């Protein structure tokens, strides 16, 4: 797996090695070809706000956006395609300043929040979304399972990027995350297509 991190945020405390590790783990667990590529861009609030308006027509910043290179169906790739081969999956955009605010409200550190958002972004690259309630429940359950498994994988290797949080907001359901989004001024992750 080739994961490139481009950090243009100017924000302290972003552990690029952790972002690469969690993305590599998640994509591997999802049976993505080991030669696949993805990019994680870490940006400032102004850049994220611009992208959010330009691509989602939503004002203000958000924590994560994903730009898949191809339209995939969860677990199967494109409906008309062969199984995943080596490919460029797409780009994940993270905003650590916004993520830090969410982490503080949720009661865990920014490192965990960025790992959660990277997992969320990887699932979007693979075709998962949260437009419909049943899809949202499936995506958030899978996100939490993968993130829990990543912490277990890190422990088995004797690696700790940040302590595994045990608070209720660390592995949120879709409903929990919606409540958190209301607490952080200026953004959040609305369900795709959700009226503002």
Curated annotation (Swiss-Prot):
Binds 1 zinc ion. InterPro entries: MetalPrtase_cat_dom_sf_prd, YbeY, YbeY_CS. Its cofactor is Zn(2+). It comes from Corynebacterium diphtheriae (strain ATCC 700971 / NCTC 13129 / Biotype gravis). It comes from the Bacteria. Signal peptide: none annotated. Its EC number is 3.1.-.-. GO terms for molecular function: metalloendopeptidase activity; RNA endonuclease activity; zinc ion binding. It is found in: Cytoplasm. Zn(2+) binds at residues 120, 124, 130. Belongs to the endoribonuclease YbeY family. This is Endoribonuclease YbeY. GO terms for cellular component: cytoplasm. HAMAP family: Endoribonucl_YbeY. Keywords: Cytoplasm, Endonuclease, Hydrolase, Metal-binding, Nuclease, Ribosome biogenesis, rRNA processing, Zinc. One of its GO terms (biological process) is rRNA processing.
């Amino acid at each position: 797996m080739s994961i490139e991190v481009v950090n243009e945020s100017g924000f302290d405390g972003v552990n690029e090695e952790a972002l690469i590790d969690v993305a590599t783990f998640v994509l591997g667990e999802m049976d993505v070809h080991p030669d696949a590529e993805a990019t994680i861009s870490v940006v400032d609030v102004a850049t994220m706000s611009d992208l959010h308006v330009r691509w989602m027509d939503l004002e203000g910043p958000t924590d994560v956006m994903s730009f898949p290179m191809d339209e995939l169906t969860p677990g199967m790739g494109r409906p008309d395609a062969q199984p995943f081969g080596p490919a460029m999956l797409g780009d994940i955009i993270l905003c650590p300043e916004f993520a830090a605010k969410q982490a503080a409200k949720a009661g865990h550190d920014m490192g965990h929040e960025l790992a959660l958002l990277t997992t969320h972004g990887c699932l979007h690259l693979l075709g998962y979304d949260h437009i419909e309630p049943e899809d949202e429940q499936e995506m958030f359950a899978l996100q939490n399972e993968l993130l829990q498994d990543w912490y277990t994988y890190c422990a088995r290797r004797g690696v700790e990027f940040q302590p595994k949080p045990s608070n209720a907001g660390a592995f949120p359901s879709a409903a929990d995350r919606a409540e958190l989004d209301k607490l952080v001024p200026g953004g959040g992750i609305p369900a795709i297509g959700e009226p503002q």
